[in-house]
Amino acid sequence: MKFFNWMQNKLGGKQENRKSNTSTSTTYAKPEPREEFSDWPHSLLAIGTFGNNNEITQNIENQNTQQEDPSSSEEVPDFTPEEIGKLQKELTRLLRRKPNVEKEISELPLDRFLNCPSSLEVDRRISNALCSESGGDKDEDIEKTLSVILDKCKDICAEKSKKSIGKKSISFLLKKMFVCRSGFAPTPSLRDTLQESRMEKLLRTMLHKKLYTQNNSRAPVLKKCLENKKSIKKRNEDEAEERIDEGSKWVKTDSEYIVLEI
């Protein structure tokens, strides 16, 4: 234990001397503390051969606090009046430069472009100025503002519709390009359209005549067939009636034949 106390006194004495040196002379740099024997107690006490546990923990805590707070003992260096005067002059120069910087910022072209008011705000300001000069009623002011807003909305809707039409046409063309392997068909000329129309008319007339001629030729044939069927039916009916009439008549030859047989 005496050995450890002697080591702590040595380390404590060195730190106190360093503190006194820093307080007296602020211009000198602080020498770095020597840490040759700082790891000795930890290594010896970790083996568990010397001292009690309570004393060991207290010594370790004291050493840690002394090593962690070296800046608390340092004093803030005092400024001379000459240095204070120089600082004041520099601050006044910086404060005088601020308005010039603001003027330069206000003269920037991009700043003007970005901070320019919108068309709606301009119209609203103009309408407010006109209303204040003329001294009209509030209803007229409201109508003017509403008309301006509606006009702007119509313009925006028209632009959107144009853009949508353009997008649709582009998508349609792209689909045609991908679907048609041979690409786009050539645009038909006026002669081709006229020739096609004439050919279509001729074909229609030919088909119409053929259909109606077939119908007209079939009509008399059907009539004849129906008449023949009717005449045949009448003949058959007449023959059947004649046969019935002939069977009901009495023939003398029959009676004579019967008598002869008896």
From Swiss-Prot:
A Gene Ontology BP annotation from the UniProt entry: regulation of growth
Keyword Signal applies: no
Region (Disordered) location: 1-40
InterPro entries the record matches: LAZY
Domain of life assignment: Eukaryota
Alphabetically ordered keywords of this record: Growth regulation
Recorded phenotype for the gene knockout or disruption: Roots exhibit a negative gravitropic response, and grow upward in the opposite direrction of root gravitropism.
Motif (IGT motif): 43-49
Function: Involved in the control of root gravitropism.
Family of this protein: Belongs to the LAZY family.
Protein's name in the database: Protein NEGATIVE GRAVITROPIC RESPONSE OF ROOTS
Organism name: Medicago truncatula (Barrel medic)
Taxonomic classification: Eukaryota, Viridiplantae, Streptophyta, Embryophyta, Tracheophyta
